[in-house]
Amino acid sequence: MAAKPGIPKGTRDFSPVEMAKRNYIFNTIRDVYHLYGFQQIETPSMEMLSTLMGKYGEEGDKLLFKIQNSGDYFSGITDEELLSRNAAKLASKFCEKGLRYDLTVPFARYVVMHRDEITFPFKRYQIQPVWRADRPQKGRYREFYQCDADVVGSDSLLNEVELMQIVDTVFTRFGIRVCIKINNRKILTGIAEIIGEADKIVDITVAIDKLDKIGLDNVNKELAEKGISEEAIAKLQPIILLSGTNTEKLATLKTVLSDSETGLKGVEESEFILNTLQTMGLKNEIELDLTLARGLNYYTGAIFEVKALDVQIGSITGGGRYDNLTGVFGMAGVSGVGISFGADRIFDVLNQLELYPKEAVNGTQLLFINFGEKEAAFSMGILSKARAAGIRAEIFPDAAKMKKQMSYANVKNIPFVAIVGENEMNEGKAMLKNMESGEQQLVTAEELIGALTK
Amino acid sequence: MAAKPGIPKGTRDFSPVEMAKRNYIFNTIRDVYHLYGFQQIETPSMEMLSTLMGKYGEEGDKLLFKIQNSGDYFSGITDEELLSRNAAKLASKFCEKGLRYDLTVPFARYVVMHRDEITFPFKRYQIQPVWRADRPQKGRYREFYQCDADVVGSDSLLNEVELMQIVDTVFTRFGIRVCIKINNRKILTGIAEIIGEADKIVDITVAIDKLDKIGLDNVNKELAEKGISEEAIAKLQPIILLSGTNTEKLATLKTVLSDSETGLKGVEESEFILNTLQTMGLKNEIELDLTLARGLNYYTGAIFEVKALDVQIGSITGGGRYDNLTGVFGMAGVSGVGISFGADRIFDVLNQLELYPKEAVNGTQLLFINFGEKEAAFSMGILSKARAAGIRAEIFPDAAKMKKQMSYANVKNIPFVAIVGENEMNEGKAMLKNMESGEQQLVTAEELIGALTK
């Protein structure tokens, strides 16, 4: 008795319709990356554990999928070690490879390994799956795709500008209305400097973020509870209440941060990015948002995140500037800036708003009904001509009942069906049926091609 | 001191140029699959080991990459079992998941799991990597892509015909001249039947294959050495010496196999496939080749393989008809037929024959030289218009030395460079340089777009 097959938890099969939608997402992102001169690379699914371990924190190390060594993976391990049953320690003996956890560390490894072949600035994109042994839950998977673009080897803020243009263009093409949030790590550092509470910056941004919900008094109360001094809270007031246009916000920040060189640098960078983008004219809103504080340890300059306006969902794209991507692999001084589109969340948003263009999801355009060997042979001739003209077409391979064949066309959403019986054959034509309108007309091969390619 | 990073043996990084070439291959195959009504699916990289084990023979089981269970993978294992150090047995306790070894078993699992959602016949294609812990060697990798198309749930030989048309179309598009070899498992069974040596069929095809090299006498000698009776060898003579057109070969086989019902069925099937293809008109040669005997245990009807004519390399595509794909997962009676393109070998052939179309490998079409902030700001305006017109364009992000920027354009094979200095800015124009001819002309944004989109 064969076992009923299943798949590992947190993983997914993608059906033809889901794949068509996913391809639409990936192709749209890819096309825009190309418009901006980014080039694709791919790295192996497995990396050496020595490359991956220690790059994602202790928690990250635990979430790596490790691959058991081939052959006798027990060699070199003492009985005592075995009986210790120390799962983490022995994993590093049983396994020397792991599945990649993100695209950033493999990219850093790639840059270091291929430094002599790469011409900098290197504008690369990468669309590949990553794996995390996370507890699966709604919207969180153990295998999912990342779509990253990074420019490394250039400090220019034009890179930040272009990445925001890419974000704007991609979501405009999707038809998803978004707000692009932008902040700068240097501004956050500046704030910490002027209030003298460098280690409290996350607490501060979390509290500020609640202003709309809980009001100023409660925000200040929360800050005090987090151990921030009265004096510091007083200094924070203009920042908590920061409002108005981006220009107004930047003006306020210049005053508040006048004593912090780093802070002012962050304001200046943001000003350049926002001003240049204003000149270029974005289709979507871009907003300076001081509560944005993603990946503090990693980013060193501009940081950004994208929120969908019409769907309740977390950030659907994010990124920022980092200053030392490759240092951990012994190559210092490589600055970079990148973005990552969240394909799975974009998939959900497009589904919820029903924004997939019809042609993105449609496959076969024409099905020939099969009435038997002779009719099929005749149909195959027209079919070949249709395909040569670029029409995606098929013939039902078996002379099954008409009902079954028509139902196949319906399920596959095929818009046209060609019916070739004895009468049609005698006339050297096919009956072309429009499945939506129900309209039928007797056509030659050329007329059929004309009808489907117009 | 950071360790010099490497990647697991048998795996590869793909550079931008390699990726462009690989995408050209995948896109060509994908486009043709679509023309024939095939739909894409994807399955997870990891499958349950219970799904994979026992499907590829004992050797295959050893070549599976196994993924260590998360958490305490020692639980439920006795000290005695641990100390036995039985690597294979304990792997099944330490690991419950493995990386997929091919696309066929996951596809079978998919069909069984989703049988209620699938409308048959199901024409699916799948382009994904597979992993094998094989000893790496030239042209053999531990991670490589397969590009499979299968039709399941239809016995019709039209499926075989269409798969051969797909093969013909794909290689015509690549510009690779090929010979499509076709055989039929039923013909081989028939031969074994009439000579009464069912278990010797592989020995027979191997010996026949050497006819050109070693001559008839030596072939017969080899057959005798393999323990085939004198009487059987006599009966085999017309088959060993089989020659002429496909029609002539089929005529001979009809006579020789007249006592084998299965053999005659195989001849009849081959006749239908070859005759229909002749009517359709293939661009490449198709040849009935009795020495073709791939995967005997698996295939049950037509089998095929593709050989490149202008490069010395093994089969670059193969496939065939199987009758019980899903039986091992408890779903009987599903017949199917499929092909698999060998992307890595096709990559090598296209490289060797230098057949990549120029536009497939080219990325960015236009680079703006960056002379400083003001010039860059002006250039960004034209750049936006060019991109909106679909031109893949970039600006060098830093105001680096001219030589460095021009060298970037050269390395990236960018055909046009736009130079915007003070003079150009004052005229509201850009100097457009054709990198191949060296020709320069002063153009407006509109003229620039015109020059690059014509």
Swiss-Prot record, chains A, B:
GO biological process: histidyl-tRNA aminoacylation
InterPro entries hit by this protein: aa-tRNA-synth_II, aa-tRNA-synth_II/BPL/LPL, Anticodon-bd, Anticodon-bd_dom_sf, His-tRNA-ligase, HisRS-like_core, HisRS/HisZ, HisRS_anticodon
GO cellular component: cytoplasm
Subcellular location: Cytoplasm
Record GO terms (molecular function): ATP binding; histidine-tRNA ligase activity
Main location: cytoplasm
KW Cytoplasm (keyword) present: yes
SUPFAM superfamilies per record: Class II aaRS ABD-related, Class II aaRS and biotin synthetases
Catalytic activity from the UniProt record: tRNA(His) + L-histidine + ATP = L-histidyl-tRNA(His) + AMP + diphosphate + H(+)
Subunit structure of this chain's protein: Homodimer.
HAMAP family in alphabetical order: His_tRNA_synth
Similarity section: Belongs to the class-II aminoacyl-tRNA synthetase family.
UniProt protein name: Histidine--tRNA ligase
Protein species of origin: Bacteroides fragilis (strain YCH46)
Taxonomic lineage of the native organism: Bacteria, Pseudomonadati, Bacteroidota, Bacteroidia, Bacteroidales
